[in-house]
């Protein structure tokens, strides 16, 4: 993975072709007259109204005079000035407390976590209870039919990473899909062995303080008594690909009991799932992995063409290991290693730690400059290239690759290959292989009164996973077999899939998850992580850089326009709320930009932060999320 430095060092004399900047809406290019992102925003900006002007002035007054009074610690802590961007009008709620904070992607589930803390539970108890709730409510993201990762830091300073990522069944093989991506995404063959319940029990046995059954009771009641339909869930079930939910007997009884989808605020019920959770609460994970729940799941998956067996379920195990560590701005950074993507995050932080991101012309206020944003994007491209050699270390001895990604010398080498004047095509970044895009996911962050911290990232992969809902148990099964690479498929850039991530029995696919904890002067300062599949790593990097390098509040670090680049395709993705100066600046460097509409958010962050003895929580409004604290 050596780097050729000549192309970057000689770029000053190069003639740079200015790439056009395109705007897409979802998967569709906007105008047929090839209007650039810059011209589109210019046209939009040229039609101001008196109402808009009034609202902007009112918002400015509110932010400058009212918000600091309401929350002075959060507004001024480590903040030098304020970003310029268009308020997208969504709910932006920062919570604060002294005893505990829980940030999830659904307000009810955040409140359940705080309820557990109030009942004497700790951060691990709260994370498990909130995670169970998210899987039942936002069932398009996660659930007990999936898996994930949990990062825990004890108040005494010890930390553990729990890997309960799903595993490939014993009957799986690298050629099992024969190049048919549909088989890996929908139906029985797409289902990997679920790990979430095993992971929760292992964390609870290590650190939990409340009885096991207490962690399930709030969600059991919620699913029996009915949960008002949240905005995000109502939006997801109405996507065209799920229109059949209205007529399918297993799905319609939950989301369309009268033949039409429930509206926001109308109650939905999941009694079958409530009964399943009751059994797990009473009898423990054994009933899920070796008892009647396992029998039902195995029978159902096999009826749908899958290869899951009782032996696969019984043999699932959780991997408990040391996290990986880095340093950034005098903070200790803790995250999880492969098959997480923590190595890529540490690489990005190492690269940017020695870069003056205030160099250049200010484009978003403060010290956020054109050259600074360009360096952030270029670093993301190098991170993505580094991810192509990561995989389940149980099956692939990638110690040399991991050590290289974590080394400061490699970060120096990359820094020398980032030009202040231009971007490059994908060959410059030395990616060795293609990698599949993972999807979906949920993340939650918790800090309790004793400063125990937990970051939990869980997933069933694509929305509603394999789209298999086992009717007797109410469990929605994952499609994480799609996160493996399959041989014989060369991507549009001529790269073959990574052999390190090929399917093998018992193997766990590579993931983009990066639950992360930052420690300052021996105490947890921040816990964060994200959802959004392959865009998680860059979203976490983006948030940390804004908070520490650009001195932003927690609020603006999470809510301001987010940047993403995964090398392939060679496109910068940005929230459409970005100001026009940013597009002009990126066009100057040769970047191609895809503006992401507000209604199609591509990554979401849940973060909690401690400063001056006060805890703050913020759940990303891109997913209609709200945190809770007390």
UniProtKB/Swiss-Prot annotation:
Cytoplasmic side: 1-49
Subcellular location: Endoplasmic reticulum membrane
Enzyme Commission no: 3.4.19.13, 2.3.2.2
Membrane-topology descriptor: Single-pass type II membrane protein
Taxonomic source organism: Schizosaccharomyces pombe (strain 972 / ATCC 24843)
Domain of life, per lineage: Eukaryota
Protein task: Catalyzes the transfer of the gamma-glutamyl moiety of glutathione (GSH) and other gamma-glutamyl compounds to amino acids and peptides. Major GSH-degrading enzyme, catalyzing the hydrolytic release of L-glutamate from GSH.
Family the entry assigns: Belongs to the gamma-glutamyltransferase family.
SUPFAM superfamilies cross-referenced by the UniProt entry: N-terminal nucleophile aminohydrolases (Ntn hydrolases) (SSF56235)
Protein name: Glutathione hydrolase proenzyme 1
Molecular function GO terms recorded: glutathione hydrolase activity; leukotriene C4 gamma-glutamyl transferase activity
Glycosylation sites: 156, 180, 315, 397, 417, 612
């Amino acid at each position: 993975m050596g780097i050729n430095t000549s192309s970057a060092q000689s770029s000053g004399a190069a003639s740079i072709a200015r790439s056009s900047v395109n705007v897409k809406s979802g998967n569709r290019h906007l105008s047929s007259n090839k209007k650039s992102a810059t011209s589109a925003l210019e046209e939009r900006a040229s039609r101001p109204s008196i109402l808009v002007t009034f609202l902007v002035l009112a918002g400015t007054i509110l932010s400058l005079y009212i918000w600091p009074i309401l929350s002075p610690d959060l507004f001024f802590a480590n903040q030098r000035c304020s970003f310029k961007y268009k308020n997208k009008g969504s709910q932006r709620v920062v919570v604060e407390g002294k005893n505990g904070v829980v940030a999830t992607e659904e307000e009810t589930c955040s409140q359940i976590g705080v309820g557990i803390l109030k009942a004497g539970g700790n951060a691990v108890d709260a994370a498990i209870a909130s995670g169970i709730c998210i899987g039942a409510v936002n069932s398009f993201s996660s659930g007990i039919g999936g898996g994930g990762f949990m990062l825990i830091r004890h108040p005494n300073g010890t930390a553990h990473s729990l890997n309960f990522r799903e595993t490939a069944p014993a009957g799986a093989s690298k050629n099992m899909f024969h190049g048919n991506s549909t088989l890996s995404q929908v139906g029985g063959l797409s289902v990997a062995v679920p790990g979430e319940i095993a992971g929760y029990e292992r964390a609870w046995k290590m650190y939990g303080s409340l009885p096991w059954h207490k962690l399930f009771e709030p969600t059991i009641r919620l699913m029996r008594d009915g949960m008002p339909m949240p905005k995000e869930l109502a939006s997801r079930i109405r996507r065209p690909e799920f229109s059949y939910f209205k007529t399918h007997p297993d799905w319609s009884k939950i989301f369309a009991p009268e033949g039409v989808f429930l509206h926001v605020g109308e109650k939905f019920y999941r009694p079958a799932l409530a009964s399943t959770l009751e059994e797990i609460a009473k009898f423990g994970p054994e009933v899920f992995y070796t008892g009647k729940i396992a029998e039902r799941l195995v029978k159902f998956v096999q009826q749908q063409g899958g290869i899951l067996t009782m032996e696969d379920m019984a043999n699932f195990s959780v991997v408990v290991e040391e996290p990986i560590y880095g340093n950034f701005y005098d903070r200790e950074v803790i995250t999880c290693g492969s098959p997480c993507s923590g190595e890529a995050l540490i690489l990005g932080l190492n690269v940017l730690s020695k870069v003056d991101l205030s160099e250049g012309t200010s484009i978003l206020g403060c010290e956020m400059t054109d050259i600074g944003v360009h360096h952030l994007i270029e670093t993301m491209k190098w991170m993505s290239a580094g991810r192509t050699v990561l995989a389940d270390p149980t099956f692939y001895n990638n110690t040399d690759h991991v050590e290289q990604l974590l080394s400061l010398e490699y970060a120096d080498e990359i820094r020398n290959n980032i030009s202040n004047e231009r971007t490059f095509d994908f060959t410059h970044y030395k990616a060795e292989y293609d990698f599949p895009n993972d999807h979906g996911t949920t993340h939650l962050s918790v800090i309790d009164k004793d400063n125990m911290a937990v970051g939990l990232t869980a997933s069933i992969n694509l929305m509603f996973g394999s789209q298999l809902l086992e009717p007797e148990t109410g469990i929605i099964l994952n499609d994480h077999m799609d996160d493996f690479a399959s041989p014989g498929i060369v991507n549009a850039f001529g790269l073959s899939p990574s052999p390190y991530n090929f399917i093998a029995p018992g193997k766990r696919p590579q993931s983009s998850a990066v639950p992360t904890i930052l420690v300052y002067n021996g105490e947890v300062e921040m816990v964060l992580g994200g959802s959004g599949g392959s865009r998680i790593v860059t979203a976490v990097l983006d948030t940390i850089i804004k908070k520490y390098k650009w001195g932003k509040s927690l609020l603006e670090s999470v809510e301001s326009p987010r940047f993403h680049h995964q090398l392939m395709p060679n496109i910068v993705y940005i929230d459409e709320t970005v100001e026009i100066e940013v597009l002009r600046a990126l066009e100057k460097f040769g970047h191609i930009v895809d503006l992401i509409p507000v209604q199609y958010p591509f990554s979401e962050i849940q973060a909690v932060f401690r400063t001056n003895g006060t805890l703050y929580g913020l759940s990303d409004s891109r997913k209609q999320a709200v945190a809770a604290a007390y």
